[in-house]
């Protein structure tokens, strides 16, 4: 109903009088126009109070005498658009069943995780197939591997991963297979086809970027080429490009100090089959892994076994073949890699809530093998890499495990640069991206994280400028899109629903990695993850659309659309809650979060647009006393605000009582009283042109930013009964809530202080700091505020991770409320000017546009 002159139909409010008492009687409160008079009648039950009202048509000074009308951009989202969101996007019953099936199948994937699922490596299988029978007969010890080679040649005559064509990979695998078949004098047809493939395709390697080159290629390929020549295989040995590769190998071998090869484990252990002429086999055995392998490489381990007859090498190969049957992968195990990347994948796709137990089991496993020097792709891998280590550090830390950022020092050189392996200069886009993502989850004083952030940002931005940039370690569907998102929406600006939407579009179910050969990880990249992510996203979006429609109807029926002094931002505000508390079970939490946020916005505009401090103090007193009798003395617009507020929070208080098992209206009143006191103080500052000190300003402004008010009410709906002790850990006196308010206030001020100064508002973090330090410039003050904010965000990280006295969902609510402010004020005032900023695009993708 609309509040319009000369009509009987006016906003109707259902209210509770004396809601704090045990009686909790429900009565009807509403406004109506008195017939033939300029009075509004507030009716409570059978009684009514007449309040004089001057029509705006008869008195143009309505706003000048009470409220100063401020010009705001109109709401961007029109009713017809919101109303058009129909059930056509709702998940059908068949899709609900499919979701259940996919969840069950993915749970089973996690339960089946052992040492790592991966595809065959023709290259490594060829090396294992070379091993002669231990009884001295002229037969292979693993004849099943020879048979696998014979049966798995591709149609073009090559061997290798069939889904991806990489000339380096195919040529390497094909050369290994034709040598093995020649050694066993079998597969003449296959050898002939393989040689033909080599002759016609070898030149393509020259056209591929160096970053496409498999790990250790320049070591193992020339060595095998030399062996092929001895065997008399008809290959184009005189190709200039092949000669260049041989020269690179010779140059690299000269750079390898002999003492380094045997002093400590390095990635050279991964390619010992290509170093046979220089290896001291007795010395190299000191670097054998506990599982009997050499850096988890079947090819390297097979070469060592053929040279030494070491039983542990053979045990490892038997172990791998027992798992895979008649072939081997390019490295194994991959247990840490598989678990970390699977967890990261379901989290980024936004489906992790379905797999909480499975994720905990996976991370418990990783943590049990965590090493302060870093980790590799397998639990007993002696050579840690920055990719697995950074991924582990970030995920384990965010899940509450005690891990130190000092682990990254293993991978930093004397120039402050970060590399994938200790003592090497190799790095790729995906490993630097993982280090960058990790660096944002920093705690105060962790300089190594800041160094990692600067180094990786520089590297990744340079990679984006290079059109031909290709990742060293992975074949990703859209690695460029992943990097662009990560650099633009860093950890404190990336909301879960937005990241899920982006990653669903960038995720490749057929993504592969590049080690010594191309390999795939089916428990990391598969169609099931993607299908579930799409269905789940659309299901949640449908729920959110219905909730948004209800909230907009509430806004209109409450009469707020007639308040000309405030902003209508129902859709943007609802988006702010749905972007992180998106699960179905938090529906009421989202509703309360949105309604509380709307009232803070109305009150903010009310107190900013004041004409009389007495009116504002009256309003604050009415909230404090929860007293309807003060309605008579309020201006008309203030009356609508108070009645809508009064009734809404009486209803909320009743729902809180059901959920928390006690009457908490007093708690709710107190939360609002604290906020309105902060508003009043700011109004007094504004009217007197007072500029407080920086500390005085922050003490008040970290409350007036309203985030604490919103959180302290909506946290009562997270599904847990909260004790007074828990509430004390997130009240306005707590460090956690202060940091949330502080970071929110500072990011707001950095983007709005100039515009507000133009409107006569003198107090901001920047202006107050300049008052304390008159010798500095505005730019210096702004930089100081940014530094304070960044330090506070690091403290907030630590509170979020380590404050175990606060339930996880409470922590999540506080932390993500701080993050949503960083997103909204990324470009400017994203709430007031949302129609001109990317916020409107985020709203569309999160709430309106389903995923096909």
Swiss-Prot record:
Record note on domains: The Asp-Xaa-Asp-Asp (DXDD) motif is important for the catalytic activity in the class II active site relevant for the cyclization of GGPP. The Asp-Asp-Xaa-Xaa-Asp/Glu (DDXXD/E) motif is important for the catalytic activity in the class I active site, presumably through binding to Mg(2+).
Cofactors: Mg(2+)
In this chain, Mg(2+) 4 is annotated as bound at: 385, 387
Q: EC number(s) in its UniProt entry?
A: 4.2.3.44, 5.5.1.12
Which sites bind Mg(2+) 3? 748, 752, 756
Q: Which residues does the annotated transit peptide occupy? A: 1-53
Which pathway?
Terpene metabolism; oleoresin biosynthesis
Q: Where does Mg(2+) 2 bind?
A: 604, 608
Residues annotated to bind substrate: 252, 472
Q: Which Pfam families match?
A: Terpene_synth, Terpene_synth_C
**Gene encoding this chain?**
TPS-ISO
Q: What is this protein called?
A: Bifunctional isopimaradiene synthase, chloroplastic
Q: Provide the residue positions that the database annotates as binding Mg(2+) 1.
A: 604, 608
In the record, the note on similarity to other proteins reads:
Belongs to the terpene synthase family. Tpsd subfamily.
């Amino acid at each position: 109903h609309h509040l319009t002159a000369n009509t009987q139909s006016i906003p109707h409010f259902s209210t509770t009088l004396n809601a704090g008492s045990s009686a909790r009687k429900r009565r009807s409160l509403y406004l109506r126009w008195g017939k033939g008079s300029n009075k509004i009648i507030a009716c409570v039950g059978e009684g009514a109070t007449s309040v004089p009202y001057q029509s705006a048509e008869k008195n143009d000074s309505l706003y000048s005498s009470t409220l100063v009308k401020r010009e705001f951009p109109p709401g961007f989202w029109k009713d017809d658009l919101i109303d058009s969101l129909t059930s056509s996007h709702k998940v059908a019953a068949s899709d609900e069943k499919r979701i259940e099936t996919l969840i069950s199948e993915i749970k089973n994937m996690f339960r089946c995780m052992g040492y790592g699922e991966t595809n065959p490596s023709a290259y490594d299988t060829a090396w294992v197939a070379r091993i002669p029978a231990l009884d001295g007969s002229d037969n292979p010890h693993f004849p099943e591997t020879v048979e696998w080679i014979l049966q798995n040649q591709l149609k073009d005559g090559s061997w290798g991963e069939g889904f991806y064509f990489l000339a380096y990979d195919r040529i390497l695998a094909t050369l290994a297979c034709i040598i093995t078949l020649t050694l066993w004098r079998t597969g003449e047809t296959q050898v002939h086809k393989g040689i033909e493939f080599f002759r016609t395709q070898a030149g393509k390697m020259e056209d591929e970027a160096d970053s496409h080159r498999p790990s250790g290629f320049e070591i193992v390929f020339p060595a095998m080429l030399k062996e092929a020549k001895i065997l008399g295989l008809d290959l184009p040995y005189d190709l200039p490009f092949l000669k260049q590769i041989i020269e690179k190998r010779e140059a690299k071998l000269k750079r390898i100090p002999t003492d380094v090869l045997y002093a400590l484990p390095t990635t050279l252990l991964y390619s010992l089959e290509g170093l046979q002429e220089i290896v001291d086999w007795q010395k190299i055995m000191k670097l054998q892994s506990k599982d009997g392998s050499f850096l988890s490489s079947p090819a390297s381990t097979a070469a060592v076994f053929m040279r030494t007859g070491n039983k542990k090498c053979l045990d490892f190969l038997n172990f791998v073949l027992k798992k895979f049957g008649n072939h081997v992968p390019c490295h194994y195990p991959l247990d840490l890699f598989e678990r970390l990347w699977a967890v990261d994948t379901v989290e980024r796709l936004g489906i992790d809530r379905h797999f909480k137990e499975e994720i905990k089991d996976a991370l418990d496993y990783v943590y049990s093998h965590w090493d302060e020097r870093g980790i590799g792709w397998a639990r007993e891998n002696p050579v840690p890499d920055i990719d697995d280590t950074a991924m582990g550090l970030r995920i384990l830390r965010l899940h509450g495990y005690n891990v130190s950022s000092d682990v990254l020092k293993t991978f930093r050189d004397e120039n402050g640069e970060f590399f994938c392996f200790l003592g090497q200069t190799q790095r790729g886009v995906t490993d630097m991206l993982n280090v960058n993502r990790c660096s944002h989850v920093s705690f105060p004083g962790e300089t190594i994280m800041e160094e990692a952030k600067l180094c990786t940002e520089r590297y990744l931005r340079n990679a984006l400028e290079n059109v031909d940039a290709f990742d060293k370690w992975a074949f990703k569907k859209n690695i460029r899109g992943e990097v662009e998102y990560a650099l633009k929406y860093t950890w404190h600006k990336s909301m879960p629903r937005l990241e899920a939407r982006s990653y669903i579009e960038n995720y490749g179910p057929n993504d592969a990695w590049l080690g010594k050969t191309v390999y795939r990880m089916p428990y990391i990249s598969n169609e099931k993850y993607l299908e579930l992510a799409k269905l789940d996203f659309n299901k949640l979006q449908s729920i959110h659309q219905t909730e948004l429609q209800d909230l907009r109807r509430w806004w209109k029926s409450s009469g707020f659309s007639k308040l000309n002094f405030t902003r209508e931002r129902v859709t943007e505000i609802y988006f702010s809650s749905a972007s992180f508390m998106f699960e179905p079970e938090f529906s009421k939490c989202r509703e309360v979060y949105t309604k509380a946020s709307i009232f803070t916005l109305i009150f903010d505009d009310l107190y900013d647009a004041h004409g009389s401090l007495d009116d504002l103090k009256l309003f604050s007193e009415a909230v404090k006393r929860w007293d309807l009798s003060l309605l008579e003395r309020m201006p008309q617009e203030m009356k609508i605000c108070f009645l809508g507020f009064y009734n809404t929070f009486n209803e909320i208080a009743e729902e809180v009582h059901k959920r928390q098992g006690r009457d908490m209206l007093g708690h709710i009143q107190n939360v609002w009283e604290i906020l309105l006191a902060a508003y009043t103080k700011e109004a007094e500052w504004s009217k007197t042109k007072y500029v407080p000190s920086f500390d005085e300003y922050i003490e008040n402004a970290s409350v007036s930013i309203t985030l604490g008010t919103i959180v302290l009410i909506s946290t009562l709906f997270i599904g847990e009964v909260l004790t007074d002790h828990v509430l004390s850990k997130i009240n306005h006196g707590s460090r956690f809530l202060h940091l949330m308010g502080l970071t929110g206030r500072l990011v707001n001020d950095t983007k709005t202080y100039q515009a507000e100064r133009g409107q006569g508002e003198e107090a901001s973090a920047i202006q107050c700091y300049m008052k304390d330090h008159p010798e500095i410039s505005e730019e210096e003050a702004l930089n100081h505020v940014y530094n304070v904010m960044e330090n506070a965000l690091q403290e907030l990280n630590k509170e979020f991770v380590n404050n175990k006295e606060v339930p996880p969902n409470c922590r999540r609510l506080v932390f993500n409320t701080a993050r949503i402010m960083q997103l909204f004020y990324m470009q400017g005032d994203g709430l007031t000017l949302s129609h001109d900023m990317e916020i409107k695009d985020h709203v569309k993708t999160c709430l309106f546009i389903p995923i096909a």
